[in-house]
Amino acid sequence: MKISIVTVTYNASTTLEATMLSVFNQTYSCVEYIIIDGGSTDDTINIIGKYADKLSYWVSEPDKGIYDAMNKALKIVTGDFLIFMGADDLFYNNDVIQNVVSQISDIDAVYYGSVLFKGIGTKHLGKFNKIKWATTNISHQAIFYPRIIYTTHSYNTQYKIYADYAYNLNLLKDKVNFVYVDEIITLYNMTGMSANTLDETFQKDYRSLLFKSVGVSAYYIGKCIRCLYFLKESLKKKYL
């Protein structure tokens, strides 16, 4: 079984090499590694070139954002399953791919695990149900998409930050099977783009996407949970 790993980069010279090494150090050998760079102007290209002989493919050219670059990758990868690894994220250990592959029994299902926040040590997010889907997304650095999915679905580039969330919600709407594996997949850097940025277009469509994917009840329960969370955080900042 071949696993495709894709890293999308832009001016990531301070973090990319560590990410690449975490891929190369995987004990599972049937891997293709692809880097899609958006025309970096720092030392990123030199770092990619340093390891070019270990890459299945790489390119550096202007793009229209991270999801445009990810869509480019969807047309190139050839693996049975695909995972996107951020240019500032790391596989949790050298056996991650091997551990996940050993648990794959349905080649048409989406497999996902958890991530661990760098510097905090908090595990995120465990197994999902409809209500959890209504409150948050699975980190795309923890998802393995099968060929039947990544060859037939692309990212909506109108969503600048949360196209991966919309992607997953649309898969749920289409009754795609998501299978949880009890593994930490990635050390996730919370300073990345989606960790600190809003997506106004996505927010406008959020309710509709959830109604169609998880249902009205789960949406409103999730909304209550989010409101309570933000109230708790606000009170902590005010009184602690």
Q: Locations of the language-model features?
A:
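Short, acidic, metal-binding catalytic loop of nucleotide-sugar glycosyltransferases
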Residues: 21-30
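Short aromatic/hydrophobic "clamp" motif used to bind/position activated sugar donors
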Residues: 82
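A conserved acidic beta->alpha catalytic loop
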Residues: 37-46, 86
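Short beta-strand/loop segment that forms part of the nucleotide-sugar
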Residues: 30-39, 59-60
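Glycine-rich, basic loop-to-helix element that forms the pyrophosphate-binding segment
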Residues: 60-77
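Conserved donor NDP-sugar-binding/catalytic core segment of glycosyltransferases
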Residues: 90, 94-124
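Acidic helix N-cap motif at the loop->helix transition within catalytic regions
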Residues: 14-17, 42-50
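Conserved nucleotide-sugar donor-binding catalytic segment
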Residues: 120-205
